[in-house]
Amino acid sequence: MHRSLAIFAGLILTGIGLSLSPSATPRAAETPSEIKGAFRLPEKNGWTFVHLQGTPHEIGFQNGYLLAPEIADTLKVVQLEATHDSKKEWAFFRDAAQNMMWPHIEQEYRDELQGISDGATAHGVKIDLWDVVALNAAEEWSYYVKYYDKQHRIQTASLGVPEHCSAFVATGSYTKDGKAVIAHNNWTGYLDGERWTIIYDITPARGKRMLMDGLPGVIHSADDFVTNSAGITITEATIGHFSGYDPAAIPEFVRARKAAQYSASIDDFARIMKDGNNGGYANTWLIADINRNEIGRLELGLTNVTLEKKTDGYFVGSNFPINESLIKEELTSIPRI
């Protein structure tokens, strides 16, 4: 698979807000009541802006209804990539979504995931709940597969060319105006990269409003590039060569969404990400708090976790960890820098 598509996203955070006003009206009256207040705008420069609001099930329903064809298309890609890379059938991932992940997903996000399935179905595209959960877990399946194969003494298939990304966050004397700057650079495969084009504007009944990029049919960014109405902006770079997974803990996509929705500080973000950490999609997270003009780096292994914060300085991430204990204990090999 080609893995050279670059997607660059950067925000200079001075005065950034989430006060977007829709220029489109809701769909016609015959559409489901759950769609009220939600809308999608025509594609512009390759991006599709989607506004979702309401209860967890309403937000999910709107996602599924407004993006039904795109979700079905993206699901085919995720199925192809997951089965090709792991040498396992899609039923393996559906079963893990239902029996391994679902018991550790709290009700709020269960409702939203079910809503995505219900919304797509209401739009004439039948998408099963377990397909929706498996789609949302796309970025952490490789971690589970390595764990599963090790437990069952199976040789895990290796990828020829891994994906890469890099990011930085800076503040104080390291930026032109002394305020926070954050940016992210992501090289991903052509198949999923060309579909990673949804800009979600989500106003939940509880928690913070969020603006993020993502695939169709997901509850989190996974790219990751997110900012919320409390001034918390988040990105990450994956920790390369990481090995570790706890199937009895909370999926990464649930923790990442919850952290984006409920964080009002860097400490909030770190606490939510660490609580129930399953080791899936292990990342070096970079965070900016624009209200406090503070930045942070959360290096989140399964057993080794480091949080650093600064009000003057910078942090970077580029698929390699800093924590020496994490390098020694949780990597299969030392990344070449």
Regions found by a protein language model. Give the residues of each.
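Bacterial N-terminal signal peptides that target proteins for export
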Residues: M1-A9
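Bacterial N-terminal signal peptides
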Residues: F8-S21
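N-terminal mature-domain region immediately after signal-peptide cleavage
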Residues: L20-D267, I272-G280, W285-T311, G317-S318, ...
